[in-house]
Amino acid sequence: MIQYFASRKDRQHIIVQELPTKPESFIHLDMVFTMLAQDKCMAYSPLILQSNTGFNTTHIEIDNGQIRYHERNNFLEATKHVGFDLEPVLCGGNDSWYQQREQWHSGANFFALGEGKVLGYARNTHTIEALNNAGFDVLKAEDVCSGKEDMHAHERFVVTFEAAELPRGGGGARCMTMPVKRQKVNW
């Protein structure tokens, strides 16, 4: 893959985040990191923000066929190097026990409807509280579906929904979606 990008001659950046192989709640990046808005992301702090975790973060820079590898201290440091200086909203809030528990329940996995508009599990109460503290209005899915709440009246929001079987199987809000054709985001 790297050679393919190098053959294109334009500038490319690839960030590789090593993930734990166990438990299964770390199956892919969406389980520890999700873009919420142009300036904010949902992050599982022990893996995405901390240094010396034992899991490598590699920034691969490809420019005019030249390939350079840079080891970064953490994932958000790597995103900052490529022009995305993100403010993290912490999965599970500031408490390490809640972070671990809510990450296990797909607390970092959200489906983005648009800029600052996301869907996620209501069960991750500390994560939802962290989103609310970061300026996201909290809307219940049943209120949106019944017409009691209008999503369009909110600039930034998280729609929370109840679920039991999908989280038990290890899936998050994004895991339930099929590809969505969206308009290009000019970041």
Over which residues does each language-model region extend?
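The feature marks the mature, well-folded catalytic cores of soluble enzymes
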Residues: M1-W187
